Swiss-Prot record:
This is Photosystem I assembly protein Ycf3. It comes from Nostoc punctiforme (strain ATCC 29133 / PCC 73102). It holds the Pfam family TPR_1. One of its GO terms (biological process) is photosynthesis. Keywords: Membrane, Photosynthesis, Repeat, Thylakoid, TPR repeat.
Amino acid sequence: MPRTQKNDNFVDKSFTVMADIILKILPTNKKAKEAFVYYRDGMSAQAEGEYAEALEYYEEALTLEEDTNDRGYILYNMGLIYASNGDHNKALELYHQAIELNPRLPQALNNIAVIYHYQGEKEKEAGDNEAGEALFDQAADYWIRAIRMAPNNYIEAQNWLKTTGRSQIDVFF
């Protein structure tokens, strides 16, 4: 059964109806519309915690979607799933692919930084301060890029950059 037929709450039903109306009136080709349906169903499954199902929908959307920006969002959402399941290496791979296709994704840059920071913490806990600091430096680089794109976001990252001496004066202005 298509995911769109499973939506049983008012908000999901409303979103589905509106998305279907927009799909019908948008001047786009059938393949792009079909890709969006899979993407929408992937988001719905992801929101319900049905990660395996969401990944299937996203994979199908990737095979159909030709727009690089949209492909970037699909890869980003797939990265979210892998990160939430603890597969940080796969999440990093997908976030990097997303940024290659759509460089205006500060949320992907932030998530890369979060993973590098987490890995840095783990290295330091294991007693490898040098590896931990190297990962912190990588996290800082990605947070700086994210903050430059969205200066009103990532306040905790901005504070971390300042308190660790990794901020650059022009980052915040």
